[in-house]
Amino acid sequence: SFGTSALGDMPDTYGYSVNEGRARETINAIFDSECNLIDTSRNYGFGIAEQRIGQVIQERGGLPDDFVISTKLDRNMKTQKFDAARARKSIEESLEALKVDRIGLLHLHDPEHCKDITEITSPNGSLAELFKMKEEGLAETVGLAMGKTELMLEIIKEWPFDAIINHNRFTLLNRNADELYSYAYSNNISIINAAPYASGVLAKGTEKSRLIAYSEATDQELEPVKELEKICDKYSVPLPAAALQFSLNDKRISSTLVGVTKPKRVSETINLSKFIIPNEAWEEINQLPYSTHDVEAARQYKPG
């Protein structure tokens, strides 16, 4: 599956801009590919990502057959308010922007950043509103998309979610989401593992990127990546192929979500998913140490 946060033009997060023309070409490439899920959010680029997807859907005369839109209810980014009324406003904005009358997979997004968690978890909060939207037919399935795995685990134990999205916390470098994924899998909650490239460095390598989980990495933090690069070079394996297939090969994970910003990245990603990696390479990769801490613990969240 493919993610569209950068297609909302978020230079504060990614360090570069994506203009409308390139974004729309990329969205068309996603719709024309063999994948069947596109993920976005009300707050990606303050609504720009959804708007661009909606324009493409309108131009194509509707969503492709059997294609799933995954989007997210978001808090008010100015006030951080995330009560039921804000959740209702968020879905209304999404439906209008995306040019659809229902959402295939609708998540509650980033509750850890809201002003007051009780606005979300109370009996009349935004979570209850999310499930009401499913009852009303505005969403076919509902999920929880967030980062902090401990809070995420608490919430999914209390509510009957169909799916979850977690990002940056189950990669070749980090396994912070391992317990969360085991619980979700054993309770029939579909898992979408996002950001298998650790937000950059596992796609581009240490020569071109120092980004790990949207932050500049130290030399020490880059050492495990360099060890991975040595193994991949030894077996002539592209580093991003190993990073992607690490997620794809985990039986618990239903879908691996990769952000793309150029049309050619869609076909390149699909090709990486099919690259044949020798067992000897996996044996060496699997012996490397990894982190289990929250890789985004010190991240300064930037909405743009």
Locate predicted features.
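Active-site mouth loops of central-metabolism enzymes
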Residues: 7-21, 73-86, 117-118
